[in-house]
């Protein structure tokens, strides 16, 4: 893709963590890199930024080659048009918010910097904090300031290293929503490193699973979360299918909402959902009950018709992971081996997936 960040990097043996990673992202994409501590996630970002110089391979951003060891090309960090938000945000204690952003606007005439800095602060909802220093800002406000400074350089890619690690869960949710809204206004890809799979579920279009510097799996989030052959991901984040749905209808009287996706309609608690929105949906594998005939007299709303498209036994837990094709979407269900035998579950067999409304996660 011409407007993409494309990465093909190998880190030499003297690097802290050897890497063998390929990654691509287009404008407004969020490419997540997920893995445990020590997987090489930060080393990968530092390699993209030119801060880790023991790399071989190729990095191209919007047609500009940043790294190509075969041709002897390795641009220094200041020549790579990128924004980098580190885990500690890297803020200066003596500067207020406005000056943090203004010093990153050296490419603009001096008389334009203040107004542009104010505009960027407003973009991240910090317009009323322009005169405040980092010590007086909350963790979430510090993160917003770091992002405003990072995008002030008008970068071609934004690199985020565990951007939500220093905030509580409620603040994390709010910042995720803000970043999701912001990415639609930025004509650039975002590479997001995280050890919390909720960040992937709520923000990412694609994910690369990284372990000890090597790619375990990579692809669209919906594709990766619906695979039956990734016990590593199940152990790290729990099994559950992720897909996008539209809020088709909200019933104010019953306090329920209809979510439409290519496999049908799901009924969920309405909460703050509004009609016409697109939302990310996660269905935990443990919350799906399988049936071969339509049951009666149940309280649950959601019965989806599908077909068994995959089976995998988890030797460690003793459960069987069943992949169900519902339209173009694939769900995962965890059942016992006994259930597989009793229901004669086999690839290609029609199956019903029963899901409680309150078990469906909507973000």
Predicted segment positions?
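Conserved ABC ATPase "signature" region
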Residues: 64-69, 112-129, 180-181
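Glycine/charge-rich catalytic "coupling/switch" loops of P-loop NTPases
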Residues: 265-312, 329-330, 334-363
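Internal alpha/beta loop-helix hairpins
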Residues: 184, 194-264
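Conserved ABC ATPase signature
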Residues: 133-137, 141
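ABC ATPase NBD coupling module
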Residues: 66-83, 107-115
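A short, proline-enriched helix->beta-strand linker immediately N-terminal to the Walker B motif
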Residues: 152-156
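Catalytic Walker B motif of ABC-type/P-loop ATPase nucleotide-binding domains
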Residues: 158-162
């Amino acid at each position: 893709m011409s407007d993409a960040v494309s990465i093909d990097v190998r880190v030499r043996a003297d690097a802290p963590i050897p890497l063998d990673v390929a990654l691509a992202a287009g404008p407004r994409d969020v490419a997540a890199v997920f893995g445990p501590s020590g997987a090489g996630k930060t080393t990968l970002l530092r390699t993209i930024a030119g801060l880790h110089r023991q790399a071989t391979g190729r990095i191209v951003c919007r047609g500009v080659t940043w790294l190509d060891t075969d041709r002897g090309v390795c641009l220094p960090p200041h020549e790579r048009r990128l924004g980098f938000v580190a885990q500690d945000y890297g803020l200066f204690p003596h500067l207020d918010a406005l000056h943090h952003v203004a010093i990153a606007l050296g490419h603009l005439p001096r008389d334009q910097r203040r107004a542009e800095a104010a505009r960027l602060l407003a973009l991240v909802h910090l317009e009323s904090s322009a005169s405040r220093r980092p010590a007086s800002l909350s963790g979430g406000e510090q993160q917003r300031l770091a992002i405003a400074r990072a995008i002030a350089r008008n970068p071609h890619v934004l690199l985020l290293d565990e951007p939500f690690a220093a905030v509580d869960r409620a603040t994390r949710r709010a910042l995720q929503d803000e970043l999701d809204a912001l990415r639609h206004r930025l004509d650039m890809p975002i590479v997001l490193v995280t050890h919390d799979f909720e960040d992937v579920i709520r923000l990412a279009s694609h994910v690369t699973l990284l372990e000890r510097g090597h790619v375990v799996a990579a692809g669209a989030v919906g594709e990766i979360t619906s695979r039956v052959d990734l016990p590593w991901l199940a152990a790290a984040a729990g099994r559950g299918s992720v897909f996008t749905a539209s809020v088709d209808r909200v019933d104010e009287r019953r306090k329920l909402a209809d979510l439409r996706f290519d496999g049908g309609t799901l009924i969920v608690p309405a909460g703050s959902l509004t009609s016409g929105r697109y939302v990310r949906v996660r269905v935990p594998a443990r919350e799906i009950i399988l049936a071969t005939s339509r049951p009666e007299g149940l309280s649950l709303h959601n019965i989806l018709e599908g077909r068994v498209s995959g089976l995998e036994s988890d030797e460690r837990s003793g459960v069987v992971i069943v992949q169900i094709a519902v339209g173009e979407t694939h769900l995962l269900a965890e059942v016992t081996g006994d259930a597989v035998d009793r229901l004669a579950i086999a690839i290609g067999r029609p199956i019903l997936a029963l899901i409680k409304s309150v078990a469906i996660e909507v973000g």
